[in-house]
Regions:
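Short coil turns linking two alpha-helices in DNA-binding domains
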Residues: 40-43, 56, 70
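DNA major-groove recognition helix of helix-turn-helix/homeodomain DNA-binding modules
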Residues: 58-73
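Short, charged recognition helix plus adjacent turn
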Residues: 1-4, 75-84
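Short alpha-helical DNA-recognition segment
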Residues: 26-47
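Short, solvent-exposed alpha-helical "recognition" segments
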Residues: 51-56, 82-83
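Residue-level signal for the short linker/turn that defines the boundary of a DNA-recognition helix
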Residues: 27-29, 55-58
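Residues within the helices of the helix-turn-helix
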Residues: 22, 31-32, 61
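A short, Lys/Arg-rich alpha-helix, primarily the initiator
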Residues: 1-27, 72
Length: 84
């Protein structure tokens, strides 16, 4: 199965998600947050740096729980602002 290329909007949304997760993580280590979320630190690193801009829903949900974020907050903070 061939994966279709990501759109610029999907890449931007992934970058916003990564930035939000980095901010929410603060001084806590990637390994600590990844462990609580049940994912690898490498997966978290890829999401935070935009190398995995479209993570699975349950991965995002687990990270939200580990970081004390609501899914609503993630949606609002990662939503694209329409061009004027």
């Amino acid at each position: 199965m061939v994966r279709t290329p990501l759109t610029p909007e999907e890449r931007e949304r992934g970058e916003r998600l990564g930035q939000l997760l980095r901010e929410a993580r603060g001084g806590r280590s990637m390994a600590d947050i990844a462990g609580v979320a049940g994912i690898s630190a490498e997966t978290l690193r890829k999401i935070e740096t935009g190398r995995a801009p479209t993570p699975a829903f349950f991965t995002v949900a687990a990270l939200a729980r580990a970081l004390g974020l609501s899914m609503d907050e993630i949606v609002v903070r990662c939503a694209l602002v329409p061009a004027a």
